[in-house]
UniProtKB/Swiss-Prot annotation:
InterPro entries: KdpA. Signal peptide: none annotated. GO terms for cellular component: plasma membrane. It comes from Leptospira interrogans serogroup Icterohaemorrhagiae serovar copenhageni (strain Fiocruz L1-130). Keywords: Cell inner membrane, Cell membrane, Ion transport, Membrane, Potassium, Potassium transport, Transmembrane, Transmembrane helix, Transport. This is Potassium-transporting ATPase potassium-binding subunit. The lineage of its organism: Bacteria, Pseudomonadati, Spirochaetota, Spirochaetia, Leptospirales. The keyword Transcription regulation does not apply.
Amino acid sequence: MVTEWIQLLIFLFALLIFSPLFGLGLYKVYLYKTSGFEKFLYKICGIDPNRNMDWKEYALSLLVFNFFGFLLLFLILFFQNYLPLNPENFPGLVWDLAFNTAVSFTTNTNWQAYSGESTLSFFSQMAGLTTQNFLSATTGLCVLLALSRGISVNYNVFALGNFWKDMIRGTLYVLLPLSFIFALFLVGFGVVQTFSESVSAITLEGNTQIIPLGPVASQVAIKQLGTNGGGYFGVNASHPFENPSPISNFLQMFSILILPGACVFLYGRITGSIRHAWAIFSVMFTILCVGILIVWTFESSWNPISGTLGFWEGKEIRFGILNSSIWEVATTVASNGSVNSMHDSFSPIGGLVGILNIQLGEIVFGGVGAGMYGMILFVLLTVFLSGIMVGRSPEYLGKKIEKREIQMSILGILLPSTIILLFTAISVSVSDALSSLTNRGPHGLSEILYAFSSGAGNNGSAFAGLNANTTYYNVMIAIAMILGRFGVILPVLVIAGSLAQKKRSEIVSEGSFSTEGGTFYILLLSVIIIVGALTFFPVLTIGPILEHFIMFQNLTF
């Protein structure tokens, strides 16, 4: 137990120390002078890096870029059997699975209704999925940059930056070098990286077993750093070829949260309010710590079904309950979705924490860039409510918060929640959806709820007892992923454009609500819990909460 506490504290302190340092590094990346290679890229792509955009042009560029990324990935997957680097001669994916997978990786969700080692070729994994892991992560970073600039400028609707320049710099100077270095570390610790074909082995029982290989480390590096999460293997980071040792496990857990944590301080530096960034980071850090402690406690508690201490089903013995608990909370507070244990086998309350983390809107660290701009929607709502309470016009970092900003904030917060509840309600009423369940009762409801929470929240993890590789779920979850991603991005860019055209007052007026102290911390935390968590309380009571109490009657589903 002492060793586990030491490991947990090392993990949390590492996150606390390195997040502001990485944030400073990100900030400096976007201050660099244009390099020769960068100029060459701009020239061959026909990009004018000095041309700034308003929010409409920025949004249009982002949507067009992501659409063509989706289209290219769909074609790669659909025509996989005609493309190179397919030593196992895998066929092309059927249209609905190709559609779902292309949407999934384009939206940074990485929901996987297939098992990678038995479905996708090396080319599809590398040129298709890994490429989108880079581009989808940088897309989130671009949106955060646009919002940060919109808040920090005065009367300049064309000060949101250049989407193409932001995309190239984020990929070239942030994700590529970090992923390359991290992949080398992973290879050193035993993660597979090869183009060799699958190996046949004779087991101790005398049976033949096929051991799949592939370029795993290069995909694992960006899937964690980019908060993507999609695994090369079906069981993700539970597989010893993806995550062979406690050291690789620790590094991957840390890499899930480091860039989302750094984005908080990138935002603080661009807007000129580091103390405000620390206040936001404190809220995120608090929710993370509480989540880990709750999951660890319940996963280590008495299991009335097996009559033993601890919920060990679905967990890797080599990692133990603590590492499984940390990973579950880290991967669900971030829009990562990778797993080193099976969430479907967690205790009801342990699973509840994972679902709720996603349903909050992936704002506690969240995705690269995406978590921070999602959190700002809650910050604006908090500032607005506090302004109403004290009877003053709400201000945020020197700018007036008015009707348009609040409308867009509420839209960005409520749209994913509406999608989750609506699509879950439809699915429990449709026979095609119910036929995919392998568990009934409250746990079956939790599996469907988790699937649409994961899709709309762009997380990608799952309660794997649900057979999601059907036309119904492939299409419905893909729609949820699209709306959950771009239904938040567009309101954020509208807010950025609206704030950019306003004057920023450097003088804090008397009676203005401070966004740096303990009062702001408490109010923001309260708004997240009330608006985010209570939205889902009714459905959670008939899902994991009900399952928790039924479990003590020795009933399972």
